[in-house]
Curated annotation (Swiss-Prot):
Record text on subunit structure and interactions: Homodimer.
Subcellular location, record wording: Nucleus
Organism of derivation: Arabidopsis thaliana
A GO BP entry: post-embryonic development
Annotated region (Disordered), positions in chain: 129-148
Binding-site list for Zn(2+): 88, 91, 112, 125
Name this protein carries in UniProt: Zinc finger BED domain-containing protein DAYSLEEPER
Gene name, Swiss-Prot/TrEMBL: HAT
Amino acid sequence: MEVYNDDTEMRSPETQPIKETALEVYNDTAEIRSPETQPIEETALEVYNDTEMVSPETQPIKRRKKKSMVWEHFTIEAVEPNCRRAFCKGCNQSFAYSNGNKVAGTSHLKRHIFKGTCPALIHTHDNDNNPLMSTPYTPKTDTPRRRYRSQNNASPYVAFNQDKCRQEIAKMIIMHDYPLHMVQHPGFVSFVQSIQPHFDAVSFNNVQGDCVATYLAEKQNVMKSLEGIPGRFCLTLDFWTSKLTLGYVFITAHYIDSDWKIQKKLLNVLMESYPEADEALSLAVANCVSEWGLEGKLFNVTFNHPASNSAVENIRPQLCIKNPGILDGQLVIGNCVARTFGSLAKDVLEKGKDVIKNIRDSVKHVKTSESHEERFTELKEQLQVPSEKVLSLDDQTQWNTTYMMLVAASELKEVFSCLDTADPDYKKPPSAEDWRHVEALCTFLKPLFEAVSTLQSTGNPSAVTFFHEVWKTQSDLSRAIAGEDPFVTGIAKTMQEKVDKYWRDCSLVLAMAVVMDPRFKMKLVEFSFSKIFGEDAGKNIKTVDDGIHELFTEYMALPSPQNTTSEGGKADGLSDFDTYIMETTGQNLKSELDQYLDETLLPRVQEFDVLDWWKQNKLKYPTLSKMARDILSIPVSAAAFDYVFDMEPREMDEYKTSLRPETVEALICAREWLLESNASSSAAAQNASATIKSEA
């Protein structure tokens, strides 16, 4: 006997002898029953197709109930004598079923349903509500064989879903910053139609609505994640310009989560029609606070670019009126450290612009001609110059590229000095004076470059990171001003004015962050201020000490489970015990802050995690740890890490300025959130994989 796949015929057992044992082969299950467990007549071999049972004898056929799920969608009708066909209940299309003794299988019927070719099923069923779609379809092999099919290795068919496809297109456009009009591009339409002819093309308005819907859904997730944040929020304001004189304010929240990890989240991108107005930024902050429910939760605001005094003063009331406990709005940083150091670098480059042009022209001569570069390389090898630096032209909108060009050229100055002998086209090598000035420029730019590079390497650097950088820069400038080189002195004086202003505006914030680091506390403040202010150091140290104690007093006054009183006015019934301690020890009980400041400094280990230390000591310092959490969340930079070396404010592209302000905000914010979500998922998957490997 031969048993064929569903698409083949079944031959009568009369043409082939059959053993006395009974064998039943069931389609789709391949169940073999033992003769001991079920007595069967000698010639009783029954082969069950998905449709019926065929007996080897001429006796009346005993029909068996059809088991295949396809019969929920098909009916059998006789079209001619000894010829029956299967008709689809949805589209009424007919398929071969039986012709005489030949019985077709059900594979072609399954394909009609599973492959989604039935017009009646295309738009009315999906994988979740159609039970048939959840049954996987396995293509047949060319070689006839008994079917012992495994359901685990089959790939389930997913029905076409127009709404799901539109959601994915919206996410694609958002994540990859594609233009909304791409859905109407002929190439895109043709591509999609070739993949899924049933997909209905979407218009610009449709995809714009889909993108906004995606943004709103993601916004709900962000809002939910922010509800459980135990501390306060710090806001950074990044201002973008446009060719249409419109301004765009990017507002990002910085905070420390319940696991004591510093986080940030883009909240708003607000268009300002009159960005030069002093109240523009304060209105943007007010809208953000109201929209995200941050009343009473603000701690600090940091500006990306220098703000006018009036603009800063307009922000302060929003911090102190509805946000008690933040020193009457003193914790406002009018200019972030990235822009401050960028402005200093710009001053350096401006002072040396003539020298830099000579160096740039020399580098351009080498890099814009293969023959010139070959001669330069050959000369370098002949002179045995050990430098591994590679020459490159600078991007004048990124000051770090100019610095790296100067460093590379300075190390290769010996080659440039002799290049005119090997390359007759090279006419104007820099002079010895030029090279001396280049070295001076690099001396000023190097500490700025290293400090700003920290913003890229650490992701969310705290104020502790830059306290040392700022006061060290100020000390270096003071020494440079006292020098005798007029070129160096002139640069140092120009830089000194900006550093002094930044220090006046931000020294309190930076110093308070240092105090919250158990490796430094007030000791580093005292040491650095003595270097910077000299005789006036004591007054400035007292300002920081008074500020940190005043802030702690305000935190002690805030309602919390630790210090709430009962109806009788008593905290915990141990006031008499406190009196006893004061009488027996002869001194008042120390506050958490004073106890913390009096303890010995921790060793300065390189991998120290200050947030983790406070997490471990929050029970010892219940109130002080809350204050430390908020102080250490203050960002010193409002610039995105990709743009910390920009010389000018970012500019919104013309395409986005042509869109509605709400659409611009939806596209930019949703992109940020989706990318963060994908990055978190990838990191979690990698951690899980690493854990499995380590356990194995």
